[in-house]
């Protein structure tokens, strides 16, 4: 299997980045729902689940940057034949997925009120503690962290977390299955090992 993308298939790196990101997004939901459904506030279990969620979010952010860099250096395989409208819908869907892959970790980091204990190995300071926050947000706009955090929390938790991510990921998965079973083309094979 080729490391780089070819005209017909995604390479190993693109596949690992795709499925790794998907797995981490799922893990991020598992940790946050575990925290809300099975732990009490101010308990060690709640804190552990929160720190795992934050750590996974930071990892997703790094992987997404790597995905974008890899995509720029290594173009995607050519699309399967289809109507112009289908091609536009696929491109719009992918741009929307990349947007949420950037926005979810970014709004999560910017809006968190605690340091991230990155997989309990080292600390990543919360944005509120950085000089950038002091200079731009407090100094530049004259707003407190609470005022800054409120819209970020809404975007991260309600808009993205509860709605948009699920809608886009479900649409992406259904489109892949439609290509596989409805159109019977190679779209799904390109991102797997070809044995579906």
Language-model regions, residue ranges each:
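Membrane-embedded alpha-helical bundles that constitute the cytochrome b-like, heme-associated redox core
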Residues: 1-196
């Amino acid at each position: 299997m080729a490391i780089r993308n070819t005209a017909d298939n995604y390479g190993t790196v693109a596949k690992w980045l795709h499925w790794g990101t998907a797995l981490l997004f799922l893990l991020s939901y598992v940790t946050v729902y575990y925290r809300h459904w099975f732990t009490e506030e101010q308990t060690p279990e709640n804190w552990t689940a929160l720190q795992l969620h934050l750590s996974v979010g930071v990892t997703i952010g790094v992987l997404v940057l790597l995905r974008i860099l890899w995509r720029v250096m290594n173009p995607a395989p050519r699309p399967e034949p289809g109507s112009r409208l289908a091609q536009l819908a696929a491109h719009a869907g992918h741009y929307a997925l990349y947007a949420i892959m950037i926005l979810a970790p970014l709004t999560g980091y910017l809006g968190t009120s605690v340091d991230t204990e990155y997989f309990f190995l080292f600390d990543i300071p919360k944005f509120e503690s950085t000089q950038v926050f002091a200079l731009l947000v407090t100094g530049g706009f004259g707003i407190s962290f609470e005022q800054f955090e409120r819209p970020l929390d809404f975007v991260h938790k309600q808009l993205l977390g509860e709605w948009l991510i699920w809608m886009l990921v479900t649409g992406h998965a259904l489109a892949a299955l439609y290509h596989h079973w409805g159109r019977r083309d190679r779209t799904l094979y390109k991102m797997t090992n070809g044995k579906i």
